[in-house]
Amino acid sequence: MNRRNFIHTSGALIGAGMLTNPLDAFSFTQKKTWTVGEIMDAFIAQVPNAPFAQTVDTIKVGSRDTVVTGVVTTMFTTMQIIHKAIELKANLIIPHEPTFFSGQDDTDYLQNDPVFRAKYDLMEKHGITLWRNHDYVHRMKDDGVRVGVVGDLGWEEYYTPGSRILNI
């Protein structure tokens, strides 16, 4: 193997290792297992003035006590995302937007809705916990969604951390 292939392969392996447990970046010692609640608490601890008394960032399916086998983050919890989580053996889905049609994810009126039932029942059947993360990620010191969009668009040179305005 030449040096270029070695560096490329090593970088891919290291990157894959970092993706395996993103919470390793938050500590010097690795923890063997994490519960949904511990992941939530670790995230919320980074947000100024959190936790919030009123927020949509609650568990919609599952339990804080679930031991996490993998995490899928997404903008929207579609059936495709739920199936991908099952395929990856990930039992925590963290969406940004509502899963069940309303901003508050109120589901009382949806109990007989076939789309609601399909999503909810599939997650429940596979032991998936769904924790919505909308308010907390927007209220981080640097809005997490903004930082993600800036990175995806390659606009880092136009962005000043903490600023809401990009100078393009």
Language-model-derived ranges and their functions:
Residues N2-I168:
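Hydrophobic structural segments
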